[in-house]
């Protein structure tokens, strides 16, 4: 594994060298941590070099955002910076929620830098249910604090039966997540960027091969958002899983990984 930093963004390369090879770039969701992709790493690194990174403001990356409004376009621009640092002309991007939305922004703003795109539980326009969930998380963070926000987080991410079976694991991870939580203003700016994200009128401009992947029981992002993406993107496939929640890449990695590998290996 090779590590580096560009403009404050901490990244890792699993599989070196990358020159002249197809590369997979993984982009996490709201939390921003590259560690989110642990359940996918073995399946991917057996086949391709893989680049992971902590989003700006999170994890090991710089713990602040630039002055002024922050947007999903800014998240996409950070992908370009990581690719530039590695000398990559393009990459296949796999993004979860915020990371998938950033991949869509990359497709529009820098189409030549994107190979294939995988959008997991993403969306293309504001949605009332997503707004309600994020409003609740904002109130938790502002009115109760980081510990309450982190303690409630599994409710938004995972199915109830999985939470029950994995209670000990989740409690053990909680202190780690609290200790590494981004500054409050960073998290609020990231949430507001996602709430403002709206490329719905431009979906037909994205010619890339896209896999839209969604879980039917996602409590945070309605599956109808993914169905809309898959229907309106000109060159999209749709992967639906019946169970797993918003974080089904964690709760059912085997099902997700099978569809992911098949898509990336396909024509």
From Swiss-Prot:
It is an enzyme of class 3 (hydrolase). Residues 23-139 form the AB hydrolase-1 domain. It comes from the Bacteria. SUPFAM superfamilies: alpha/beta-Hydrolases (SSF53474). GO terms for molecular function: hydrolase activity, acting on carbon-nitrogen (but not peptide) bonds, in linear amides. One of its GO terms (biological process) is nitrogen utilization. It catalyses: carbamate + 2 H(+) = NH4(+) + CO2. Keywords: Hydrolase. InterPro entries: AB_hydrolase, AB_hydrolase_1, AB_hydrolase_fold, Pyrimidine_utilisation_RutD. Its EC number is 3.5.1.-. Disulfide bonds: none annotated. PANTHER family: AB HYDROLASE-1 DOMAIN-CONTAINING PROTEIN (PTHR43433:SF5), HYDROLASE, ALPHA/BETA FOLD FAMILY PROTEIN (PTHR43433). Involved in pyrimidine catabolism. May facilitate the hydrolysis of carbamate, a reaction that can also occur spontaneously. Belongs to the AB hydrolase superfamily. Hydrolase RutD family. This is Putative carbamate hydrolase RutD.
